[in-house]
């Protein structure tokens, strides 16, 4: 062994002795180099994300205009984690979570950990404690804009607090990013949008909380309403566009379109009709939809209703779509303890 190799081996042993086993290794030595993911609860979004869902141990930002479906998208992710036996937590800084609606989306509200903090510091300290426990699989913070620094709450109404929230987020993310990776927790920050004053060219929209979240996020998801869905004259939901603005685990800028129905969330059956038609799994002739020579209905809404009434057909179409895109079957159990080490967070 050359002197250089011997010196390197000695340095590696010293590092492992000081910081623990696994603190440094060759990249090819890791047991599984693929990024572990959890389904977003929407097959269309899973495809757009590229890897089949949200990456575990990463920070995700979901942002968009008011009432666009940001919280709905996040609650579907929570429901998916709970279905696989994982633990979920929701930090409701906006104090606006509707338990009845969450329950309709499939969230087990009896098992969901909920915190409604008074200040931004309190919210982020609770988030850090939950992540460092290593026992929470998904954590949603709703929203970054509502994480008000303590100094602002205790100050007068007209006081200027320039940059306080950005500094708070920057410090929190520096502490959270490493712990999130070790605990394999998915941390979703919901964010609002604001407009920059005096922008003549380019997009005037920005998100509150400074630039730190943009840098630390592995996935940034933009949620926007495209059009209203009507049943006769009644508006029953929204056609919603989901754009993957940033993606560190797959090619970015892919888009997904989903139906978000009022009181029901993302319409799985609408997704199956759209994706099935694109792949010619579901055939469309004029206004009629059919599958395996069996007519599903005239018009998209009637075809959706057929899927609702015939879950066996829906399951078969979903299986074929997932096979085509190489996605993991939702029913496969996830080992949430895989890759976690109870000694990682020991002081």
UniProtKB/Swiss-Prot annotation:
Residues annotated for ATP binding in this entry: 64-71
Record field: transmembrane: none
InterPro entries membership: AAA+_ATPase (IPR003593), DNA_recomb/repair_RecA (IPR013765), DNA_recomb/repair_RecA_CS (IPR020584), P-loop_NTPase (IPR027417), RecA-like_C (IPR049261), RecA-like_N (IPR049428), RecA_ATP-bd (IPR020588), RecA_C_sf (IPR023400)
An annotated GO BP: DNA repair
GO molecular function: ATP binding; ATP hydrolysis activity; ATP-dependent DNA damage sensor activity; damaged DNA binding; single-stranded DNA binding
Localization (cell): Cytoplasm
Sorted UniProt keywords: ATP-binding, Cytoplasm, DNA damage, DNA recombination, DNA repair, DNA-binding, Nucleotide-binding, SOS response
Major localisation: cytoplasm
GO cellular component: cytosol
Protein function: Can catalyze the hydrolysis of ATP in the presence of single-stranded DNA, the ATP-dependent uptake of single-stranded DNA by duplex DNA, and the ATP-dependent hybridization of homologous single-stranded DNAs. It interacts with LexA causing its activation and leading to its autocatalytic cleavage.
Annotated family: Belongs to the RecA family.
Protein name: Protein RecA
